[in-house]
């Protein structure tokens, strides 16, 4: 194997549009998004963990089903705005984490959320997040466990 350059199948790295060192100290590094305002009580827990660790974050409510263009625009522009990780919480069919991953090269952490409307007790949300097609990775924490999403985001940022 030649050491003169990338080989077939080699992974190459390109610099992001915004350099980490150039970011304002108050620039959010983590975007916390959720499909509905009713998801806020659980998803706020990710923010609490990030705040404890001194990590700036932003919170948005946007539905992959009702506002697909909003989700796509948010995720496409996330890196340019300084985000480094996206935490996406959703219940039922839980499309939001996968849609976020499809529109961003940032790490996406999916938080499956239980719902009184679910006939499967949240298993539907878990399976929707973990069963992604090749090339669209989403990390998944436990059901209703946004705290672990906050911890995982912090670990990703520390690496």
Where are the model-predicted features located?
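SAM-dependent methyltransferases
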Residues: 1-29
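Short, glycine-/small-residue-rich phosphate/pyrophosphate-handling segment
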Residues: 117-159
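Short glycine/serine/threonine-rich phosphate/pyrophosphate-binding segments
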Residues: 39-44, 67-71, 92-99, 119-120, ...
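N-terminal beta-loop-helix "entrance" segment that forms/cooperates
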Residues: 59-81
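Glycine-rich phosphate-binding loop
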Residues: 74-113
């Amino acid at each position: 194997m030649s050491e003169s350059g990338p080989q077939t199948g080699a992974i190459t790295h390109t610099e992001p549009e915004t350099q980490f060192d150039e970011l304002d100290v108050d620039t959010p590094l983590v975007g916390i998004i959720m499909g509905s305002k009713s998801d806020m009580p659980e998803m706020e827990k990710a923010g609490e963990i990030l705040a404890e660790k001194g990590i700036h974050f932003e919170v948005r409510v946007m539905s992959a089903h009702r506002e697909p263009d909003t989700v796509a625009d948010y995720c496409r522009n996330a890196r340019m705005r300084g985000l480094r990780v996206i935490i996406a919480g959703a219940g039922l069919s839980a499309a939001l984490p996968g849609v976020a991953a499809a529109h961003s090269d940032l790490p996406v952490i999916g938080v499956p959320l239980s719902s009184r409307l679910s006939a499967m007790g949240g298993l539907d949300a878990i399976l929707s997040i973990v069963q992604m097609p090749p090339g669209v990775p989403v990390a998944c924490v436990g059901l209703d466990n946004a705290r672990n999403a906050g911890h995982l985001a912090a670990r990703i940022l520390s690496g």
